[in-house]
Amino acid sequence: MLCLLLTLGVALVCGVPAMDIPQTKQDLELPKLAGTWHSMAMATNNISLMATLKAPLRVHITSLLPTPEDNLEIVLHRWENNSCVEKKVLGEKTENPKKFKINYTVANEATLLDTDYDNFLFLCLQDTTTPIQSMMCQYLARVLVEDDEIMQGFIRAFRPLPRHLWYLLDLKQMEEPCRF
């Protein structure tokens, strides 16, 4: 009996496919993402992407604007030349309704991990063109109110992602010039 359980356990472990980004299970309702968002926390598997204010993915997503073509315009702010600069990035729809192709510095894909539309959105930007894929995920909120339960959900959402070492930047504990 013990041998059977061990064999079954090994078969289950070996049969697990390569891990992809876990995503929200419900169908995405893109129009419900429209509006203002606030960066609450960031996580990355590559600290150089957000270690300093000028780091390439130290960005604050401030709004999402769905287009009639089911694309997604991402409005973000970042620190450049000693001031906060607004950038607009177009996310082009793909076969997967939760993934968008983007062209932004060191990221070529935006993925929506999870959302309830009214309170939070977990979104990741990543570079899928390099052998070691760099990724930055954000916990976005509709209002600037701390919610420990959602923060724990964010941590659970990015933990199973590829790469074992993650760096978490909790924005409620620091001053950020481009966080509105």
Curated annotation (Swiss-Prot):
Homodimer. Disulfide bonds join C84-C178, C124-C137. Glycans are attached at N46, N81. This is Glycodelin. Keywords: Disulfide bond, Glycoprotein, Secreted, Signal. Glycoprotein that regulates critical steps during fertilization and also has immunomonomodulatory effects. Four glycoforms, namely glycodelin-S, -A, -F and -C have been identified in reproductive tissues that differ in glycosylation and biological activity. Glycodelin-A has contraceptive and immunosuppressive activities. Glycodelin-C stimulates binding of spermatozoa to the zona pellucida. Glycodelin-F inhibits spermatozoa-zona pellucida binding and significantly suppresses progesterone-induced acrosome reaction of spermatozoa. GO terms for biological process: apoptotic process; negative regulation of sperm capacitation; positive regulation of granulocyte macrophage colony-stimulating factor production; regulation of binding of sperm to zona pellucida. Coiled coil: none annotated. It is found in: Secreted. GO terms for molecular function: small molecule binding. GO terms for cellular component: extracellular region. Four distinct glycoforms A, C, F and S arise from different N-linked oligosaccharide chains at amino acid residues Asn-46 and Asn-81. Glycodelin-A and -F are taken up by the cumulus cells in which partial deglycosylation takes place to produce glycodelin-C. Gene3D superfamilies: 2.40.128.20. The keyword Secreted applies. Belongs to the calycin superfamily. Lipocalin family. InterPro entries: Blactoglobulin (IPR002447), Calycin (IPR012674), Lipocalin (IPR002345), Lipocalin_CS (IPR022272), Lipocln_cytosolic_FA-bd_dom (IPR000566). This protein is, the main protein synthesized and secreted in the endometrium from mid-luteal phase of the menstrual cycle and during the first semester of pregnancy. Glycodelin-A is expressed in amniotic fluid, endometrium/decidua and maternal serum (at protein level). Glycodelin-F is expressed in follicular fluid, luteinized granulosa cells and the oviduct (at protein level). Glycodelin-S is expressed in seminal plasma and seminal vesicles (at protein level). It comes from Homo sapiens. Residues 1-18 form the signal peptide.
